[in-house]
Amino acid sequence: MPKQITEIKDFLVLARRKDAKIVKIKKNSLNVKFKVRCSRYLFTLVVNDKDKAEKLKQSLPPGIQVIELK
C-alpha cells in the first residue's frame, strides 16, 4: 500500500531503515518523485524544487539500490 510523506527528513529516515530495499526516482517537468520500497509500504515523497531533489539524491544512503526512471 502506498503512503505519501511530506518531510524530507522523514524520507531519509525511512531510506535508512533495514527493510528499505530500493529507491526509485521519477522525474517529470513539474516535480521529482522519490519512492522507497519497504517491506509493507511504498513511501512516496514529491519534491517540486530540482535543486533540493539533486541534494536529496546525493544524501541517500550508499547501500540502497537507486533506479532513475525517465
UniProtKB/Swiss-Prot annotation:
Keywords: Ribonucleoprotein, Ribosomal protein. GO terms for biological process: protein-RNA complex assembly; translation. InterPro entries: Ribosomal_eL38, Ribosomal_eL38_sf. One of its GO terms (molecular function) is structural constituent of ribosome. The keyword ATP-binding does not apply. The keyword Isomerase does not apply. One of its GO terms (cellular component) is cytosolic large ribosomal subunit. It holds the Pfam family Ribosomal_L38e. It comes from the Eukaryota. Belongs to the eukaryotic ribosomal protein eL38 family. This is Large ribosomal subunit protein eL38. It comes from Ostertagia ostertagi. The lineage of its organism: Eukaryota, Metazoa, Ecdysozoa, Nematoda, Chromadorea.
